[in-house]
Regions:
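Crotonase-fold acyl-CoA enzyme core
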Residues: 1-45, 77, 82, 89, ...
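Helix-loop "lid/cap" segments that line or gate small-molecule binding pockets
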Residues: 37, 51-55, 70-75
């Protein structure tokens, strides 16, 4: 709103970017991020994306309820069970999307 310029490092601190990339490394860094997301809990990622889109038009109470329902659904998946067991065993979970 002020028209003040900021450099990339400050913009990253403000949360405008996930990461600053070194010159020439953007494609490699983007592929690594995509791989990391794809290896994660894809069902839960989909639920999160759905909630983000739906909650733009909700009040806070409805958004909190939607989040609670999404969590309850995600907690019924096999990926949740894998994540829980891996957490207890202090291991990294391997997600399968179910």
């Amino acid at each position: 709103y002020t028209g003040r310029s900021m450099d990339g490092a400050e913009a990253e601190r403000w949360g405008f970017y996930n990461k600053l990339c070194e010159p020439g490394k953007l494609a490699a860094d983007a592929k690594a991020l995509a791989h990391s997301i794809a290896a994660g809990p894809t069902f839960a990622h989909g639920m999160t994306k759905r909630c983000i889109h739906q909650e733009w038009s909700m009040g806070i109470d409805d958004a909190i309820e939607a989040e609670a329902q999404a969590q309850a659904i995600c907690m019924q998946t096999k990926d949740y069970e894998r994540a829980y067991k891996a957490f207890v065993a202090k291991q990294k979970p391997v997600f399968e999307g179910d």
